[in-house]
Amino acid sequence: MKVGIISLGCAKNQVDTEVMQGILENSNYKMTDDYYDADIIIVNTCGFIDDAKEESVDHILEVAQLKETGKLKVLIVAGCLSQRYQESLKEEIPEIDAMIGTDTQDKITEVISSALKGNYISFYDRLNKIDEQLFLRQPYQPGPSAYIKIAEGCHNYCSYCAIPLIRGGYRSRTIEDIKIEANHFIEKGSKELTLIAQDTTNYGSDIYGKFSLDTLLDELATIPGDFWIRVLYAYPTRITDSLIEVINRHEKICSYLDIPLQHIDDDILTSMNRGGNKEQILNLIHNLRKNIPDITLRTSLIVGFPGETDEKYQNLISFMQEIEFDHAGIFKYSDEEDTQAYNFKDKVSEDVKEQRYQEAWEVQKEITRKKNEGLVGTEMRVLIEEALEDEPTTKVGRTEGHAPEVDGAVIIPDCEASSGDFINVEIVQALDYDLIGEMTNEFS
């Protein structure tokens, strides 16, 4: 039996996809990227915002058509959308043969067996321990970087976010189990471990009684080998002095931090139930740049939140221009059922949201371009990821200031290095988001 998996959404969802792929390969299923040739297709969905939900539904409908045009026998929907819309999704798309939620990847073979017999089945149990599944992971995409999910769920309950409803409360993995998985990836040749969770800085609070990301990083940095460790999804009020010290002390830990702030106006932050205020955020950024002078900072920002007046929006733009984040993701507020913000008044019109979204992107593009221009003439260490398909001698890589998938890249023509090699590159040209470089040394 041939199985295809379509993975949508965030890196955390990709890890879930890799768990299912590993379980299936271990059970002698053959994986395929040719969906017309697949007997079974799993769509691992995202249900975070409207655009993501629409993309997930579109993929499900496209796959459903393969029951007529391909050899498809079974369509399985997994992930956030199936967890959130357990009953209505099957009613609206009857071609779905089975559904599993965000915590039941270990049931995938049982689900397939039942669906092949013509029996509809679904699993939505909430697990407290998922480590055994994670050890079976198989990479969904080729490359030298691996995501390490250090926790599942969230208990921040931001007013606009449905993730706690979808993925449950915060559950940390143990340091021992994470270190075993990290060792596994390094032994298989990974050159970058990217730590992810809904909130990485809350790591350990549930099982160790205190924020323990600093301790985890200390342990991971002792693993032998030449590789990077990167931290994404840090909550601003939980970035401790100890965490900053650990990031600065270890050469393996990238001088990089992703801190989703969402906004800077104090009234909006309060409405978002974010915790913290503008003054605390400014002090944090000052502290980070003072103690890690070469740090790269990324953030995520939401425009068009209910109650965002022109003045409050301009506060956000002024903040972006003052702080000059190296990278930023800009998102339009999306009404999500069953969240506090869904019932808020003073909604911002779609036209105004779109206008603010476009303007904020332009502001950030100019900032990133200026930052990139400042790198021209410098020499940087680059991790090679892949070759361009139509130009195999042109390689694409990233510096420690570029997280996988979400930030820019370094393009290196006439380069003999291979995926997974670290090389030194002189930056010769700056683009809006990417850099052009020339290799200056033998690769390793």
Swiss-Prot record:
Cofactor-binding details, from the entry: Binds 2 [4Fe-4S] clusters. One cluster is coordinated with 3 cysteines and an exchangeable S-adenosyl-L-methionine.
One cellular component (GO) term of this entry: cytosol
Top-rank taxon: Bacteria
Residue positions binding [4Fe-4S] cluster 1: 10, 46, 80
Cofactor(s) demanded: [4Fe-4S] cluster
Residues noted as binding [4Fe-4S] cluster 2 in the record, renumbered to the chain: 154, 158, 161
Residue ranges annotated for the TRAM domain, each copy included: 373-441
GO molecular function, one term: protein methylthiotransferase activity
Keywords for the protein's UniProt record, in alphabetical order: 4Fe-4S, Cytoplasm, Iron, Iron-sulfur, Metal-binding, S-adenosyl-L-methionine, Transferase
Occurrences of domain MTTase N-terminal (ranges): 1-117
Keyword Cell inner membrane (UniProt): no
EC number: 2.8.4.4
Catalytic activity line of the entry: L-aspartate(89)-[ribosomal protein uS12]-hydrogen + (sulfur carrier)-SH + AH2 + 2 S-adenosyl-L-methionine = 3-methylsulfanyl-L-aspartate(89)-[ribosomal protein uS12]-hydrogen + (sulfur carrier)-H + 5'-deoxyadenosine + L-methionine + A + S-adenosyl-L-homocysteine + 2 H(+)
A GO BP annotation: tRNA modification
Location of the Radical SAM core domain: 140-370
Cell compartment(s), UniProt: Cytoplasm
CDD domains, alphabetized: Radical_SAM (cd01335)
The keyword Cytoplasm is annotated on this UniProt entry: yes
InterPro entries in the cross-refs: Elp3/MiaA/NifB-like_rSAM (IPR006638), Methylthiotransferase (IPR005839), Methylthiotransferase_CS (IPR020612), Methylthiotransferase_N (IPR013848), Methylthiotransferase_N_sf (IPR038135), NA-bd_OB-fold (IPR012340), Ribosomal_uS12_MeSTrfase_RimO (IPR005840), rSAM (IPR007197)
NCBIfam families on file: 30S ribosomal protein S12 methylthiotransferase RimO, MiaB/RimO family radical SAM methylthiotransferase
Function: Catalyzes the methylthiolation of an aspartic acid residue of ribosomal protein uS12.
Family affiliation: Belongs to the methylthiotransferase family. RimO subfamily.
Protein known as: Ribosomal protein uS12 methylthiotransferase RimO
Organism: Natranaerobius thermophilus (strain ATCC BAA-1301 / DSM 18059 / JW/NM-WN-LF)
Name of the gene encoding the protein in the UniProt record: rimO
